[in-house]
Amino acid sequence: SLIANPNCSVSQMLIAIEPIHKKFQIDLLNIATYQAVSGSGIDAIKELNSQIKDVNVEPIVYPKKIAFNVIPQCDIFLDNNFTKEEMKVSWETKKILDPNIEVTATCVRVPVINGHSEAVFFRTKETVNKDDIVDLLSESAGIKVIDNPADQKYPTPLENANDTEDVYVGRIRTQIINEESWVSMWIVADNVYGKGAALNAVQIIEMLIKENKLC
């Protein structure tokens, strides 16, 4: 049997929204990812560091210079003008969470060494408020809520994506738009040590061994 194992950007999002979908039924989702260069490997990290020291260093790993820049392209462009990474977000979300969810993604590479960040905006079938979301996520395994706008408390890659398996959620907002319930969130996770594809694979194997489903 084959088991779907999402990539790092999809994994951290699904961990954060799965409890919400289970209780309030997400039917439309828009996500913008801000992906660290470590997701492209050691050569990408070296390229960023080299360009920070000398902005004239030409790009090899990326199509444009990554230092002091933001590149709205992760992976190659497909015929529909989305990148392959953006389509993976849609495909894997539908495959793992719910095939009926409409998903649109914009994947962006940012000059950060480690830690993927995501701005997620989604609609729920059931009416929901911020307290509902905070309470639900605070009780969910593997999720840490940092959300206190008055004290400027919210997760960032520098502070919260360092050798941790947890997914951090903040900037939680709810709105009623045209009588529909919408939620906005900010999600941060360590894409290398934490909720990356490699760790997911290990945890899936551990679960199968525990349940005696791996021969």
Regions found by a protein language model. Name each.
Residues S1-A36, W182-C215:
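Adenosine-phosphate binding glycine-rich loop
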Residues I3, S11-L136:
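Active-site-lining helix/loop region of Rossmann-like oxidoreductase modules
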Residues I101-C215:
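C-terminal active-site/capping subdomain that shapes the small-molecule cofactor and substrate pocket
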